[in-house]
C-alpha cells in the first residue's frame, strides 16, 4: 500500500466524544497489524485529537475542507462506522460530483446508496411503512406555516426533528401551538437542509433500544436489549437505563427482536446497528423511532454491559470478516456469532452538574456522564451504581433535607435525579399509588425502588457476598483469562484467587476522557515487571486489560472483599487527585 493510501475511519462530533474515543481506540488496535489506519475527524481540534497526535487528522465539517483533505489520501478506503448524518450529507454531495471515482476512494461497508434510503427521518418512516410497521403520522416541513397546517389535522403533543442536525440539536416536543412555532423556527435554523420532520409524539410510551450485529453473509445476532425507565420524551442519555430488557412479555420481546433483525437485513447494514422503539404500554403496538448504524451511546452502553467492544467487532464486520470465523472476545472455543444470554442486570444512572439540577428533562441532553452497576436484580444493580455516586460525591442534591411539597414538585416535573426523590418519598411513607400518579412511572419500576428501601432494612449478616463473571452465556461456557467480576449479595463465589497480586485502583474522575489510556499504560508497566494485576474500577471496560477485573465502588469495603479472595501484596491508586 502506498504511503498516502490509508484506511480512514470517518468520525463526527458526538455526546461525550463517544465516536471519537471509540474510533481512536479501534485505530490503535488496527495499527498493531497494519500501520495505515487513521481517524479523520470532522470537527474542531480538541484535547483528544491533540493527545492522539498523528493518529487523527482533523478537518472542518465543510464540503471544501473535506474534499481537500481526502485528496491527500487518493486510493484510500473510508469506513463510516463512526460517522453521522451530517457527514453523510457531505459524502452524498461529493458522490454527486463523481469525486470518489476520480480520487479512487472506496467506501467499505454499507454503500452510500444504502445509507441514502434512510438518511432522513421522513425516508425512514416511508421505508418502515413499506415493511409493514407502524409509524407515527408525520410531515416534512420547510416553514412555520407548513408546520401549523400539519398541526391542524393532528393532536398535540407533536415531536419536532430538525433534519440531520448536530447531535440531535433542536429536537423538541411541542404541547401547544406556541411551542410548535418556536420549536420549528429553531429547528429550521439548525438543520443543514432547513427542514424539520414533524410527527405525532409517542410521548409516554416505553422506550427501548435493540442492538443487532450483522455481517455481509447475513450472519447476525441480537447483542443487547436496553430498557429506559423514563418514557419516550426524555433523551436516553438522561434516562435511567438497564439491560437486558426484563419487563417485556415474551410476545413483546420477540416482536421487537424480529423487527430489529428484519430492518437490519432489509437495509443490508453491517456492523453494529441500534434500533430505537416506542412500545405502547397498553397494547402490543410499537413504533420504530430510529435506525442508527453509527457509533452511539446505546452501542457504548451495550458494550460495557457485555464486557466486550461491539465497536471493535462492528469494524471487523464492516471490513468483511464473518461472525462465523471471528473468535468470541470473552468465551473460550466459541465464535462471535453467539447470541448473549445474560443472568445479571447492568444499570446506568445519569449524572448531572449542579447547573442542570433544576432543568426539566426533555429531548435535549442535560447529563454530562453516567455511573454503572451490576447485580442479579434491577434493584441490586441500581444500588451498586448508587454507591459509586455517593463515593464520588456526584450527587448535587439532598432529598432528605427537602419538604414533602418540594419532593412532590421534583417528582412530578421530570427533573434530574428523579429516582432519588422517589426513594426519599418511599422512605417517608408516601403511598405507592400516590407516587405512581405523581411520577407516571410503570408500576414495575416503582416496585424496584420500593425493594431498595426494603433492602436497606436487611441485616448485613443475612448477606452472602459472591463474585460472578461478566459474561454473555449465563455461566454455560468458560471465560477467558482476564475476566471481569461483579458483586452480588447472595450467591456462590466464582472468582478464583490469585497469588501475590497487585491491585490497581482506578480512582480517576468519572468523566476523564483519557482514563482508558492511563489505566492501560499503568497495567502494562506493572505486567512488564512480572506482576499479576487486579484492576479495581467502577467503570466497565470493554476489553481485558488485567489478569482480573472487579467492577466495584472505589472504597475500603471493596478492597477488603478483594482481599478475602486474592492474596494482595501491593495496592496502587491511580488518581487525578495526587
Residue ranges and their predicted role:
Residues 465-482:
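Long, low-complexity segments enriched in small/aliphatic residues
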Residues 61-135, 140, 566-578:
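Conserved N-proximal alpha/beta basic substrate-recognition cap immediately N-terminal to
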Residues 471, 489-492:
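Low-complexity, acidic/Ser/Thr- and charged residue-rich accessory regions of DNA metabolism proteins
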Residues 140-143, 271:
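Short, glycine-/polar-rich solvent-exposed loops and beta-turns at beta-strand/coil boundaries
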Residues 2-65, 69-74, 97, 131-132, ...:
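ATP-dependent carboxylate activation and anion-phosphoryl transfer catalytic cores
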Residues 143-154, 195:
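Conserved phosphate-binding catalytic cores of ATP/NTP-utilizing and phosphoryl-transfer enzymes
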Residues 83, 143, 554:
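Flexible loop residues that form catalytic
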Residues 76-84, 429-433, 475-479:
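N-terminal-biased segments
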